[in-house]
């Protein structure tokens, strides 16, 4: 029998205010790195939350909007 792999993963967002407060969110596996501005109840302010651990993210090729001949 074949095991089914999940398309989503749960990541931990850690407050950049160094309060130790963290949040967990669910994202698709191929999504870019997540940074969010959320409320931190320890410091009682909105602060930036970044991913706690590094994960493999597929590099996206930048879009080329120039009309140059290929």
Swiss-Prot record:
One of its GO terms (biological process) is mitochondrial translation. The keyword Mitochondrion applies. One of its GO terms (molecular function) is structural constituent of ribosome. Coiled coil: none annotated. The keyword Cell inner membrane does not apply. Belongs to the bacterial ribosomal protein bL33 family. Component of the mitochondrial ribosome (mitoribosome), a dedicated translation machinery responsible for the synthesis of mitochondrial genome-encoded proteins, including at least some of the essential transmembrane subunits of the mitochondrial respiratory chain. The mitoribosomes are attached to the mitochondrial inner membrane and translation products are cotranslationally integrated into the membrane. Present with 2500 molecules/cell in log phase SD medium. This is Large ribosomal subunit protein bL33m. It comes from Saccharomyces cerevisiae (strain ATCC 204508 / S288c) (Baker's yeast).
């Amino acid at each position: 029998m074949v095991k089914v792999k999940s398309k989503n993963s749960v990541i931990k967002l850690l407050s950049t205010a160094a309060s130790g407060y963290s949040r967990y969110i669910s994202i698709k596996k191929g999504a870019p790195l997540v940074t969010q501005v959320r409320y931190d109840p320890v410091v009682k302010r909105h602060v930036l939350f970044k991913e706690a651990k590094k994960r493999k993210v597929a590099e996206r090729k930048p879009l080329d909007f120039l009309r140059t001949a290929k």
